[in-house]
């Protein structure tokens, strides 16, 4: 749009296969780079450690990540498929896309950002455990690692799957109340 009542921009989506495109980005044309560290949307997964390190070390743009550990999710999913087949109850979603999957992935992303000096923003923090990875001892203007939480992760718990079912099934999953 030539005019807008809102300030908007788009992120460039990263994959295991588009590193060269990411490295060519003009930072004036995008808000940052969005990476899915756990499979969630189409082929937007970035789980190749070499690709991740190259992205983190090669750009000054904001790197925004959806943090879920793919190996943990796959192992949890296999366990639930063994028990339920292809008809896994929705109230098991938080056990597949678990607290540990989120914590492991967020930990790795933060470690990589600290190692490379990258600007990192973690989307959709969904566990209290993940919040322990962040500090409020740094003035906001000096922070290079930030995060956000979605309201639904604050409002709903795993107990709500029984009454709301797929209406509250998203990634990262709604978790157990702390």
Protein language model features and the residues they cover:
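Metal-cofactor-binding active-site regions of metalloenzymes
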Residues: 1-20, 37-40
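Histidine/acidic residue-rich metal-binding segments in metalloenzymes
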Residues: 20-35, 41-178
């Amino acid at each position: 749009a030539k005019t807008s009542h809102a300030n908007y921009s788009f992120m460039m989506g990263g994959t295991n296969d588009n590193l060269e495109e990411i490295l060519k980005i003009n930072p004036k044309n995008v808000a940052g780079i969005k990476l899915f560290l756990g499979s969630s949307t189409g082929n937007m997964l970035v789980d190749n450690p070499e690709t991740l390190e190259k992205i983190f070390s090669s750009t000054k743009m904001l790197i925004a990540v959806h943090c879920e550990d793919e190996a943990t999710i796959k192992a949890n999913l296999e366990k639930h498929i063994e028990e339920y087949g292809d008809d896994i109850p929705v109230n098991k979603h938080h056990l597949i896309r678990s607290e540990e999957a989120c914590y492991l992935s967020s930990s790795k992303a933060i470690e990589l950002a600290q190692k490379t000096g990258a600007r990192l923003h973690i989307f959709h923090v969904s566990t209290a455990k993940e919040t322990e990875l962040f500090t409020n001892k740094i003035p906001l203007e000096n922070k290079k690692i930030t995060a956000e939480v979605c309201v639904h992760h604050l409002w709903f718990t795993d107990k709500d799957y029984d009454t709301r079912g797929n209406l509250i099934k998203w990634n990262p999953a709604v978790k157990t109340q702390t």
